[in-house]
């Protein structure tokens, strides 16, 4: 029975990975119909996604994170340069050690209710760096991040894109030790972080301003 469960689990992971990497032919008529009657799973996932700022302590297992990362690197990007560098940290010593450095320079942060770490208490953090020599690298990195967050949400994993911790790590000399551990190549700069974990909240949707989008005749 255990062997059967392991085999089925492996098949599920393979299917999820294939979903992020294998091209699939679509019937345009069927896709449009599914969208109109509300059965399009991709659109449903996009519209239901929320930024999560409260997490359960359980880290996301690495097999699941590998699926999320694979979806990320399959994002569209300019000239297929793949102008990103990605690092994943689920080591509490790294996260807590960096948080202690952060607290020394921002003592008020520790007074926030429920504060445990500077990544919204997430147990897993992804660090994304862009290539400073390529104009559109930041765009590429943003597309990569969006893919990761949406794929995570489809598997019940929450996320939150964080700019503040990245800025702290690049600006504070006290954080240099931790930035060095990420081992980014020369010319790459930490752009943002993404917190990942199992949600411990169910936030409501925030309003979007549809007036910012217009068709031009």
Q: What label would you give each PLM region?
A:
Residues 2, 7-15, 19-217:
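Acidic, surface-exposed loops and disordered segments
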């Amino acid at each position: 029975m255990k062997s059967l469960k392991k085999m089925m689990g492996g098949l599920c992971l393979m299917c999820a990975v294939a979903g992020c990497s294998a091209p699939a032919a679509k019937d345009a008529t069927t896709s449009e119909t599914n969208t109109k009657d509300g059965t399009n799973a991709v659109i449903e996932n996009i519209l239901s996604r929320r930024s999560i700022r409260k997490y359960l302590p359980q880290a996301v297992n690495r097999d699941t994170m590998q699926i999320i990362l694979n979806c990320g690197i399959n994002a569209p990007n300019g000239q297929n340069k793949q102008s990103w560098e990605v690092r994943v940290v689920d080591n509490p010593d790294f996260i807590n050690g960096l948080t202690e450095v952060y607290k020394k320079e921002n003592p008020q942060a520790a007074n926030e209710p429920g504060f445990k770490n500077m990544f919204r208490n997430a147990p897993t953090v992804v660090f994304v760096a862009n290539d400073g020599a390529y104009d559109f690298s930041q765009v590429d990195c943003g597309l990569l991040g969006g893919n990761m967050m949406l794929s995570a949400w489809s598997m019940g994993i929450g996320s939150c894109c964080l700019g503040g911790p990245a800025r702290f790590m690049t600006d504070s000399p006290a954080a240099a030790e931790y930035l060095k551990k990420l081992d980014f190549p020369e010319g790459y700069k930490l752009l943002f972080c993404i917190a990942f974990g199992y949600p411990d909240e169910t936030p409501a949707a925030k309003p979007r301003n549809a007036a910012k989008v217009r068709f031009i005749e």
